Amino acid sequence: MSGTTISSDRPNICAICHQKAFGYNYEVVSCNACKMFFRRAHAEKIDDFCKKGGKCFDGDDLLTSRPKCRSCRYKKCVNLGMRYHNSSESQTQSDEEPSPKQSVVAVVPQHIITQAHIDSTFFQHLHALNETRYNAYCVINICEDPSFCDLVAQGSKLSVYLRPQEIEWENTERKLKPWGSLGVLLAVEVCKGLSFYNDLLLSDRVLLLKNVAFKSHHLSVAYDSFIQKKGRVLAPTGTEMFPDVLFEIPKCREIIMDLLTSPMKPLMELQITESEYLLLNMIVICNPAIQGMSPSGQDLLSRHQQVYARILLQMCMVSNPRTGPGRYAAILAINQRLDRQSVITNRVVQCLREYWAPNFFFSKILTEACRSDVYY
């Protein structure tokens, strides 16, 4: 049988230039172009000097423009584990040094860590974080009103959120279960579970949570309802986010429906996958453009955002090279569309206070996240 069979569990992204690969060459997952380059470079004993500091192949965006620097390309081949095996030299050595007795040699596969393997660990960690968030969202029932400063100082509160309290919300000042506030609390836990979070200054952690937890929450609950094939965002219990009485008030219903359907529309249009959602959520969180963030914080977030963006672009290109760039851009555009949620949220609570409860409660974290005094 002729042809090339690609194993479904084998990495198919070239570890050197991030183009499409068809298997291992010289012990590293690589494309045919990099395989031939390494062979020629080894034969020619390349010693080119890099004019750009030796970092031409260190970038994340190698899909669209493969650098021409031979020195950096060869160095990356060697660093990733490419080894040239000359069969004639091996045979000559074997003939010159015969073994006194026949022996059985067990060939043990070498475990080579490629960029594709590293990327797969990202998905495992992100999937676990998201699953924990969703499971906690199904049971969380806590009546607290912390600020983002409080949340940074307290560390993780996930164990508290997983022990629901008995609360009759209609008898509290909030009047209804604050799914929005509770969801943002869990988005904060996702941020705290990321590897770089503890490397940020305390002031940068507060700024990060204040600026990204709200958007991350809206993206996450939209995805939760999308995979359950719902037409709008629902609570994890399958019930409405708001009491039925509010849907009976025409002005409130219109704005509430806008809030609950807007984040789901692009997910439904793109039929976004779980991996795409997880990466987009990280791109939303790793925002280096937050005003007031320290230079070290901006650099840290920028580097992580570039990593997640690179993996997302790779996925789109491998899935369909022709439509990949367009899909990549459309997924990133969801980030900008989420900015509307704070505006719509403000309108929702203004409406609730005008037509339903004049003293409608607005939590500290949502006050800070929306930079206003209204939310649900």
Swiss-Prot record:
Its main location: nucleus. One of its GO terms (cellular component) is nucleus. Residues 11-89 bind DNA. CDD domains: NR_DBD_HNF4A. It comes from the Eukaryota. GO terms for molecular function: DNA-binding transcription factor activity; RNA polymerase II cis-regulatory region sequence-specific DNA binding; zinc ion binding. Keywords: DNA-binding, Metal-binding, Nucleus, Receptor, Transcription, Transcription regulation, Zinc, Zinc-finger. It is found in: Nucleus. A zinc finger (NR C4-type) spans 14-34, 50-72. Gene3D superfamilies: Erythroid Transcription Factor GATA-1, subunit A (3.30.50.10), Retinoid X Receptor (1.10.565.10). Belongs to the nuclear hormone receptor family. Orphan nuclear receptor. This is Nuclear hormone receptor family member nhr-124. The gene is nhr-124.
